[in-house]
Amino acid sequence: MLSFDEALSRLLSGARQVNEIRSLPTLAAAGRVLAETQYATLSVPPLDNSAMDGYAVRVADLSTIGSCLPVTQRIPAGSIGTTLLPGSAARIFTGAPIPPGADAVVMQELCEHGEGGVVINHLPHAGENIRRAGSDVSAGSSILAVGQRLRPQDTALAASVGIARLPVFRRVRVAVFFTGDELRMPGAALPPGAIYNSNRFLLTALLEGLGCEVRDLGQVPDNLEATRAALREATHDNDLILTSGGVSVGEEDYVKPAVEAEGRLDMWRIAIKPGKPLAFGQVKVKMDPAGREVAFIGLPGNPVSSFVTFLMLVRPFILRMQGVQATAPLAYALRADFDWLHSDVRREFLRARLNANGGVELFENQGSGVLTSAVWAGGLVDNAPQQVIRRGDTVRFLPFSELLG
């Protein structure tokens, strides 16, 4: 068996990045992967401006609390005032540029109307309540790096410096199909021995959450020719083929021989629990003069095995195809509020969640077919091979918030 780290390394080295670039309106770019580093074309804020509603003043004019200054101008956001003369104040609002001559803003709560002006009940220091030009972003600075998945705050930052369109990589196109004559779709009758196809919903949603363009080829009969035909169809205009089920070594598992007939299989068994049977290879595109191949990953059929292997192996593979530079999930070192004394030669990913005491608790049944464990959990405990865990130990916790998307 391959170790988890070796399997992941091989997967990532075999991921071919999608280099086609699309130009999208910044408003539509969230969730996509940036194709070119972006630089600020202007400073933010472009001018010194007021951090709050109040009065712009000259500090030198305020020697005592209670000074009364005439208000000579009103400066709302979006307008520019004139030079503030000595011995006067300007009514100013949040975001409005500081008028020349002023060197502080006194918040309106510290002021009151007086006869002939405004009474300043505070002695400000120079620069008080002033946001300096370029304090957020300096013109010419790098604001967004190539290879990062754009979040709402990223597109907002781009918009703040006037970037109307962003270059992003084309979505990764993934064809999926599912094997197993026992599978039925929800809503259909369920004869004895049949089960509903939960993996179809699981994997489609996981792929869409990663921003993939999903082509669902549906259910494939459990025989070699049907599986080979599905593989050939899946190569058409796709970057990755993903299957669920049929990757074991049983007589009724046809994905492995089908991939070997239509291409090549590079690895097969991984020391991971759940999810030991996993196939990775390439499927040849028929009649392609360039000899193009499409990456293939076959996941195990058990729902939790499929879920965990997707998160820990397929997700970083797809991120690398998308051009994302950082593929490793953020992990937290937390206290175990459980005992796990069943050491295994494989690397284990245990369904767990945080409790109210700041520790991690474990779902009681860690079986690979127990989908309720993934629903109950808030993440995975990454447990090294042959490692037992005792209450109070520090464990490596991977929250689903880092893994889903």
Regions found by a protein language model. Give the residues of each.
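Flexible glycine/proline-rich
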Residues: R22-L27, E36, V137, E260-G405
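Short beta-strand/loop turn elements enriched in aromatics
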Residues: R22-T26, V44-L69, G101-G116, L350-A374
